[in-house]
Amino acid sequence: MPPAEVVVGIGLRRGTSADTIRAALREGVADHRIAGLATIARRRAEPGLLAVAADLQVPLRSFSAEELSVVAVPNPGDRTRTAVGTASVAEAAALLATGGGPLVLPKRVVHGVVLAAALYRR
């Protein structure tokens, strides 16, 4: 059976390098095929994230904190809410980008990058 296609939601700090993001994806979602990336709008133009999306030849979707904040997620974070105005970036972005999931990889931090993945359906 081929690996499932997923959209990976990503939360990261400003200035995170493409190499760090690639390493996190290799380690964090190795059992899945990446069909897209998603994040919060304020990180949409991060050079490292743009480079990884281009390398993978997948779309990068972004959502406002307001859009992300209405998504029910299993692992909300108070620190995230305080920092960016929503309790979830990675899980909520993955779920929004896929139209509701399901979430196949709950939030995890790999090399300082927060990852979550939701099943991509064509």
Model-found features: residue ranges?
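Structural motif
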Residues: E5-V8, A35-G36, R61, G101-V104, ...
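Long, charge-dense
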Residues: I40-V89
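Generic secondary-structure signature for well-ordered alpha-helical cores
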Residues: R26, A30, A54-R61, A97-G101, ...
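Conserved mixed alpha/beta catalytic, RNA-binding, or beta-rich assembly cores of soluble enzyme
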Residues: M1-A41, A118-R122
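C-terminal edge-of-domain segments
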Residues: E91-R122
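Alpha-helical scaffold segments in soluble metabolic enzymes
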Residues: A24, A51, E91-L95
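A short linear-motif detector with a strong N-terminal bias
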Residues: A18, T39-I40, R81-A83, A93-A97
